[in-house]
Structure formats: C-alpha cells, structure tokens
Amino acid sequence: MEAIANLHDPLSGVVVVLLADFLRQHQGWGWLRLVAGATPYKEVPGLTMVKVMGSGHGGGFSLRPSATHQGLICTFTHLDLALQFLDSPAVQAYRSRARECWSGVMAVQSARGHWDKQAWQASSAQSLGETGQDAAQAPGPFAVLTRASIVPTKAMAFWRYAPAAQADLDQSPGCLLAMGLGEAPLVRQCTFSLWQDQQAMREYAFQGSHQTAITAAYKNDFFSESLFVHMQVLGMSGQWMGKDFGDDLGMDAVQTKLAANSSEQEAAHV
C-alpha cells in the first residue's frame, strides 16, 4: 500500500467500494477479514487507503451487529489499478463466499471533511486516465459516502435519530442501494448509498428525518470528525438486496462511460 506523504495534502484518486453478505458457512472467514483489517492489502499496487468494516443487522443502521454483512472501501491512485484490484484474487475471494456481493468504482466529484485527519478532493484527470477529465457533474448513477467519528458521550443521543432516517431512506424512490457500515461499534460510523441521480439524493438529504438528524448533529456537536463525499459511478457489478446491477467493470466499459460524459459536458458548454 502506497504511503500518503503528508496528511495535510488531500487524498485524491479513484474509490472502490465492495459490499458483501456472506453465506452462513463463510461467516468465520468474514470475521477474520475484520480482524486482519488493512494488513492483507499492504502490497496492493496503487492502494492509498483501505477500510474493512462491519455492518448493522440486515446491512442497515441498527445497533445490533450483522454476522454476515461487511464492506470494503479503498482509494487508488489510478483507475486502471482500481479495476485491476476488482479483478484480483482478493476480491474474488469475497465474491465466491457471498450470498450477494456488489462492487463499484467511482470518481470523486466533491468532498468535505476528513477521515482519520485526511481530507479528500475530486478525482483528477490523471487518476482517471487519458480520456478522463476532472470529475464533474454527470448523469447516471450517483453515490454518496458519509462517515463520522461520534463523540462517545453523545453516541446514544446520536443513535436516537437513526431509525427514522433509515426508514425514510428505505422508502426513498431514487435510492438504488444503501448500507450502514462501521469501523468500530457505536462511534465510528459510515454510510454508502447509490442513487439514480443527484436530484433524488437531494430530495432525501434535505428534508424529513435525515435533515432533522443532520441539524441535530451539528447543533449538538455529535461529531469529532466527519466526511461527506459525492461520487460519479464509473462502473459496477453484482447483486444486492435482490437487485441485479449488471457487470460493467471492464476497462473498455468504464472508459466508454468517461468518454461519453466528457462529450456531454463539452456539448453543454457549446
């Protein structure tokens, strides 16, 4: 794993997310992944960050932990290295042991905040390859990653808002996928969600129970650190919660999407 030279320099590159719901006979294998953490990935080319995380019951936001659900979030210096990882034995090991597994590669459009004192920034043209431009607004599937370190003495106050926010998320018509993740029980939490477009995400984020929870979090200083990341989905593969998301994680498919998005952005400025 490539070292980050300076924590004061924002982390830039391409994001990979993998979600797994392990078969019962492979729960032990999944547990060992959590125990090992980042250690097995130290030699992965281009990898700059990796988080192996558990989840709440059913893959949701419950205080009750799931014995089968798990998530992997990684950042890479370059798109081709991210795709190489998604085709590696390490990822195939997850897929072969899972009842359902979803994986995706994404370009960061915008980011605010920090994760382990490290800021993030938009994916550069260099990280996306020769046909890529700096990540910008684009049509199609849109992903959101949020994470927070919750002040321990305020954890229970924060969690009182979770059930209503999840209920609204489950009922949101534009949400294609959502999973609650955690680095540590109660106090280091993360959410990954996939949306049909940005408008659908905004309709959920800025009204109802979610807006109430966010307002309370800032008013009461629930977080000691937080990060909010908006991402363009470049490719995804697998099944989740009974939905089939296809398989377009090949380099040709991803580069075709990047080229199409670049053409649409150029046309919009004519």
Where in the sequence are the language-model features?
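Aromatic- and glycine-enriched beta-alpha-beta binding-site module
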Residues: 75-77, 91
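Short cationic amphipathic helices and targeting signals
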Residues: 69-75, 191-193
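Secondary-structure boundary/capping residues
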Residues: 50, 91-94, 223
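Glycine/small-residue-rich hydrophobic helix-like segments
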Residues: 188-215, 221-222
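Short S/T/G/P-rich N-terminal loop/turn motif that feeds into the first structured element of a domain
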Residues: 1-69, 79-85, 99-187, 200-206, ...
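A common structural junction motif
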Residues: 89-97, 211-214
